[in-house]
């Protein structure tokens, strides 16, 4: 990872990620399409549950980023023992996180939903969906920990295979469990949740199968479970800021749902649909950033600073190109995109306006996402968190609150692109300063 030409290396690491994340985003959209066929109320229930579900995923992925960064850095420095200790501690802590998330998420969900709606049918649907999803939280945590471990050692094709297998099975199970088939009864929104959990379980099975039959540079070992407070501190030092980076959108969605609900429930539905579409539009770029992250960590550990700089520049260019394509899709295909999720003319009209405004910030957002990912790879979790705080808290919340008073609900949509422009002005100097200290 420190000798191969940078561009082919980045492409070889990123391409499996891009493919797997495209499949994952396709699953998210297909899953929502099936739920939307149940009713618009079912889609609203998913939109309301989304912030807590996203927060749980943020813990899994964010802590996994810490595992990934530490393994890659220790391997780059030639310290296999430390890399294995980081992997083992990371897996054990991930399992603990999963148990806690299951208990806490199920406990708080009824009260959380009642903050946004008094409709008992919506609340019941949200509780049904979330309870089943969070019962699989520990399985999801273990799967994502394995994903980051395989990525750290350059086995991107394994993570691609595991994710695609789980997502395809999920997509196939959705119509069967939601609407019923033969002896399988129609389960409605509960079927969508169960299909998601089974898909996560099957992805984990792929990782376990490959791990048991393949020689890897890093193994999970009982001998590495001995307490190591210094290592755990470093894992959380990278993982906690990464978790906050990923969890901040949940806080943002909760805040924006509160603003938009004051106009009509259709705006809440549109925001939920946008975030489903956002996974499809952003995940290819995020796949490139994921491919960059272990490479930057490895080369930083090996003191190859010129390669670190080149990796950042190439990732930025590739991400911006992908987001330019996303902008064109939203500008010229906003109507058919919305029609995938709803037949309500009012919701479609609101969604068209929202997509055409929000997408104005897509290209410039590449600066923030690339800088944040590079900083995580360098182990600069705090600096990465600064960028995310700007994107999801410090800029957009005040802007949305102020602009909606002058522009109505459209003010919320305008807050998105203005925030991306302001965040880019912060992100690049923060990255340059951090690299200067390396």
What kind of region is each of these model predictions?
Residues 17, 21, 33, 69, ...:
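Transmembrane alpha-helix boundary and packing residues in multipass membrane permease domains
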Residues 43-103, 140-154, 158-159, 257, ...:
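Small-residue-rich hydrophobic transmembrane alpha-helices
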Residues 1-14, 71-138, 184-240, 296-361, ...:
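Short alpha-helical transmembrane segments in multi-pass integral membrane proteins
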Residues 55-58, 102, 170-175, 204-208, ...:
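Hydrophobic transmembrane alpha-helices of multi-pass small-molecule transporters
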């Amino acid at each position: 990872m420190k000798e191969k030409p940078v561009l082919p290396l980045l492409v070889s690491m990123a391409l499996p990620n891009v493919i797997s994340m495209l499949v994952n985003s396709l699953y998210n959209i297909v899953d929502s399409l099936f739920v939307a066929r149940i009713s618009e109320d079912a889609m609203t229930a998913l939109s309301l549950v989304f912030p807590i579900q996203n927060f749980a995923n943020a813990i899994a992925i964010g802590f996994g980023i810490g595992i990934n960064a530490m393994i890659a850095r220790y391997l780059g420095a030639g310290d296999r023992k430390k890399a294995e200790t980081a992997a083992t501690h990371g897996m054990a802590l991930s399992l603990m996180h999963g148990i806690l998330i299951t208990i806490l998420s199920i406990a708080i969900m009824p009260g959380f939903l009642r903050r946004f709606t008094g409709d008992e049918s919506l609340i019941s649907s949200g509780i049904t969906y979330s309870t089943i999803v969070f019962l699989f939280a520990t399985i999801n945590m273990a799967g994502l920990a394995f994903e980051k471990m395989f990525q750290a050692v350059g086995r991107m094709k394994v993570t691609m295979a595991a994710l695609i297998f789980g997502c395809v099975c999920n997509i196939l199970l959705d119509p069967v469990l939601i609407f019923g088939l033969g002896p399988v009864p129609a389960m409605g929104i509960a079927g969508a949740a169960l299909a998601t959990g089974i898909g996560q379980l099957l992805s984990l099975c792929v990782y376990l199968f490959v791990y048991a039959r393949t020689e890897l540079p890093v193994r999970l070992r009982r001998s590495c479970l001995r307490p190591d407070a210094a290592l755990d501190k470093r894992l959380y030092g990278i993982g906690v800021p990464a978790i906050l980076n990923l969890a901040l959108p949940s806080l943002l969605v909760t805040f924006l749902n509160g603003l938009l609900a004051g106009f009509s429930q259709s705006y809440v539905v549109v925001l939920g649909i946008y975030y489903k579409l956002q996974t499809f539009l952003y995940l290819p770029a995020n796949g490139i950033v994921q491919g960059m992250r272990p490479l930057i960590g490895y080369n930083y550990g090996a003191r190859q600073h010129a390669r670190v700089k080149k990796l950042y520049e190439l990732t930025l260019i590739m991400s911006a190109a992908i987001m330019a394509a996303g902008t064109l899709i939203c500008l010229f295909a906003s109507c058919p995109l919305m029609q995938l999720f709803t037949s309500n003319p009012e919701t479609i009209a609101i969604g068209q306006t929202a997509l055409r405004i929000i997408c104005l910030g897509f290209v410039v957002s590449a600066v923030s996402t690339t800088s944040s990912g590079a900083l995580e790879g360098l182990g600069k979790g705090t600096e990465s968190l600064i960028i995310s705080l700007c994107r999801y808290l410090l800029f957009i919340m005040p802007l949305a609150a102020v602009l909606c008073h002058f522009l109505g609900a459209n003010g919320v949509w305008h807050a998105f692109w203005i925030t991306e422009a302001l965040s880019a002005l912060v992100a690049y100097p923060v990255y340059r300063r951090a690299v200067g200290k390396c």
